[in-house]
A protein has these predicted regions:
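Intrinsically disordered low-complexity regions specifically enriched for long asparagine
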Residues: 1, 154-157, 266
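Membrane-anchoring hydrophobic helices of lipid-metabolizing enzymes
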Residues: 2-135, 299-387
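Charged/polar, solvent-exposed surface patches and flexible loops
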Residues: 35, 39, 43, 86, ...
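C-terminal folded domains that constitute the principal catalytic or ligand-binding module
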Residues: 222-316
Length: 387
């Protein structure tokens, strides 16, 4: 049910911060990116499926966004979030329900350097709708009317968990429960299955991550692929071809789990409610893994998709992605084009992209290729600045 909070106007601090709704988000950028790149990558490489999204959740409080929440895949570049949001974008656009699309709160480290944006595409995350996950921004987004909200409530610990803790929910942020109660809106969990295999058998140590965070990298995955990253820099963004399955969970109404009013809750109360919700989500995710996570790669399906889309070779393979993303940025940002098609099936397209974007050659140069990429990736960085 709507609460009294839904009838009140935002506090002055929230009103002053509402510029975040439209500072960077460009629906046209997201649509053009999806049509030119993400649809192909999803169709061939990730082969994502939505399970249980037929009856798409509607707001229980019409004045407040639903809070969608999912699990992080540890030790991997966030391709799972990119694929989930792009698939939902297409699903909801097809059904004329873009109002139901969730906009993500993302870790601020992702936007502080170009290096943590896919292939150095500047402001990639924010142009696609992401907002830095700060307390003020979260509270501000609770007054957002155009879309729903999405977050990964495990936060950075969820990103940094090693393969030995795959599919294990870490402690959830209490802010999710607190704001859900205060604004009378439901939490809608969905579970990301097989993303743990985008970068499998990767582990990390806190003492190493303490230093990598200083240069804008949330964690350093220690894996056999790390050597490949050094000698072939494009592998920094590498994802193995795990079939991503997104499974809708049972919506959660935190007000049903407590008899107290929101203002009566202590920090300990919110922590206890968060743990109760974590256990509910863990049980549902375990069932989703049992149903959809036993064959994470499905090599036969991957081979079939490659054959069906062979005219787009090599663009569905990760080594070709740097040129493709860089060419997209050149066309959209530098040349200001709109409603264009990149003609990925044209013979010689990849070689022409390399010629037009010589920086992409650095992705293939062992060790020293990192020098120009790091210069571009850290130029104008916001490290040490508050989001």
């Amino acid at each position: 049910m709507p609460t009294a909070a839904s009838a009140t106007s935002p506090p002055p601090a929230i009103q002053a911060n509402q510029h975040i709704y439209n500072d960077y988000f460009r629906e046209e950028f997201t649509q053009t990116l999806d049509e030119n790149i993400l649809q192909l990558l999803d169709r061939v490489w990730f082969r994502s499926e939505l399970v249980g999204f037929e009856n798409y959740p509607q707001r229980n409080n019409p004045d407040r966004p639903l809070i969608f929440a999912s699990n992080h895949s540890g030790m991997a570049f966030p391709w799972d979030a990119i694929v989930a949001l792009s698939h939902l974008w297409r699903h909801l656009k097809k059904n004329g329900a873009m109002h139901d699309l969730p906009r993500p709160l993302s870790a601020p480290l992702l936007s502080q350097t170009a290096l943590m944006n896919p292939y150095l595409v500047r402001e990639f995350w924010k142009k696609c709708g992401c907002v830095d996950a700060t307390t003020l921004n979260f509270e501000t987004m609770m007054y957002y009317q155009d879309h729903n909200l999405m977050l990964y409530p495990e936060g950075v610990p969820g990103i940094g968990k090693g393969f030995n803790r795959k599919y294990q929910f870490q402690r959830l942020a209490t802010s999710m429960v607190r704001l859900s109660l205060q604004h009378g809106t439901d939490i809608v969990p969905f579970y990301t299955i097989n993303a743990e295999y985008l970068n499998p058998y990767a582990y990390s140590w806190d003492w190493i991550n303490k230093y990598t965070k200083k240069i804008g990298i949330p964690f350093l995955p220690i894996t056999v692929l790390l050597l490949l990253v050094l000698i072939q820099p494009w592998a920094f963004y590498l994802a193995l071809p795990a079939k991503l399955v997104f499974v809708m969970g049972t919506r959660i109404r935190p007000s049903d789990l407590t008899t107290k009013k929101p203002e009566e809750h202590t920090r300990e109360d919110y922590a206890a409610l968060s743990e109760q919700i974590r256990q509910k989500m863990q049980a549902e995710m375990d069932a989703a893994v049992a149903a959809h996570g036993q064959q994470p790669y499905r090599w036969g399906e991957l081979w079939q998709r490659m054959k069906e889309n062979r005219r787009y070779f090599p663009f569905f393979l990760p080594f070709a992605w740097p040129a493709m993303f860089t060419e997209f940025e050149r066309l959209y940002v530098k040349e200001g084009r709109r409603n264009f098609r990149m003609q990925l099936d044209r013979p010689g397209a990849w070689l022409r992209m390399l010629w037009r974007n010589p920086i992409t050659l650095a992705y293939f140069i062992p060790l020293i290729g990192w020098i120009p990429l790091a210069i571009k990736g850290y130029r104008g960085n916001k490290l040490g600045q508050k989001p």
